[in-house]
Amino acid sequence: MAIAKRKPAEPVRIELKKEDTVKVLTGRDKGKEGRVLAVNRETGKVLVEHVMMIKRHTRPNPGKQIKGGIAERESPINASNVLIVCPGCHKAVRIAHHIDKIAGGKARRTRVCRKCGQTLDRK
């Protein structure tokens, strides 16, 4: 009896980018705000600064100059559990998209706040 291989999951469409400020909606860190350090679209997870802290036990390795001990670091959380914080209204909001026409007949899609309409993309 052959074991069927699982297909790799399709990448998840995540509207968050690195350096965005987000607010955690669920879990043990509910209500905390932090900066996005990394986005993994393959697994649908984001790494948020000072959120979901775990203790990592590390063995010393003198060859690689790694000091042993218990290190505290962030763990990834599901992107559906966070919302972006608007810099204008300072609230956790959903993201809308506006299409702006630029020179040469091209269009650029920008992320905007659904509550106040301010652009969320950095210049």
UniProtKB/Swiss-Prot annotation:
Known Pfam families for this protein? Answer: KOW, ribosomal_L24
Gene3D superfamilies linked:
2.30.30.30
The entry lists its GO molecular-function terms as: rRNA binding; structural constituent of ribosome
Source domain of life is Bacteria
Enumerate the SUPFAM superfamilies for this protein: Translation proteins SH3-like domain
Q: Per UniProt, which keywords does this protein have? A: Ribonucleoprotein, Ribosomal protein, RNA-binding, rRNA-binding
What family classification does the UniProt entry report for this protein?
Belongs to the universal ribosomal protein uL24 family.
Assembly: Part of the 50S ribosomal subunit.
What is the stated purpose of this protein? One of two assembly initiator proteins, it binds directly to the 5'-end of the 23S rRNA, where it nucleates assembly of the 50S subunit.
What is this protein identified as? Large ribosomal subunit protein uL24
